[in-house]
């Protein structure tokens, strides 16, 4: 469902009242954090800043049905294999970025029969946290997956953390790439869809 700017402002304000951080709201709405900040600080009466160029990506139709997540993950897995020159032995672990990359990571790892790990990004916690309940990344060759790449900061942060932990990051993979980037931190970036603002 398309939301007007006023509807987005109300939705952002509601999420803020519920205690979500700017980062969490951005993840929930698939918008950049700068857009969320603009929606919070610029009302109709106080529209001092120019509206940021952003595109809202809604993929609830996919996320609500596991069979659809599996179908898209099959495409993700094919892209991973293509990048690995069709040799899955070159890969140890799929890392999903919490929260929206988890479903895809789990399904891709299942299809490729490799480990799955979960990274929770956090601005104030030295780059985030790799969950100890899942696969680990030290000394492993990994692919990182998320839903939407808005600015690249979350992916860049995750790659940096994984490399510090001793992982060799082979590929960054997203459902939608909202940037012109083809690599992040020297890691190839592939998006199933790329958006371009004209």
Predicted feature locations:
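PRPP-associated nucleotide enzymes
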Residues: 1-145, 151-198
